[in-house]
Amino acid sequence: MRRAAKVDDNQNEIVAALRKVGASVQPLHAVGQGCPDILVGFRRQNYLIEIKDGNKPPSKRKLTPDQERWHRDWLGQVSVAENVDQAFLAIKLTASC
């Protein structure tokens, strides 16, 4: 049996900030198998973002082996964000709004 997907402590903050600037956000963390945490639609573009908690030590922010494999094998865009500003950069916004 698969264990419940963990949600990073900052995921709700990042999702709320993305929605505030007009992005649509679909959580994907429950998919598992290394799939990124969220799918973001913004200005007619799609973005996959893996969320890591920037407040945790670097060793706790590393991609898991499944995430590394998924990122390596995916033939499209995928980003990692540790905070709102990095999530905005991932969708081509330059600063927090």
Positions of predicted regions on the chain:
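Catalytic phosphate/metal-binding cores of nucleic-acid and nucleotide-processing enzymes, i.e., regions
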Residues: 1-97
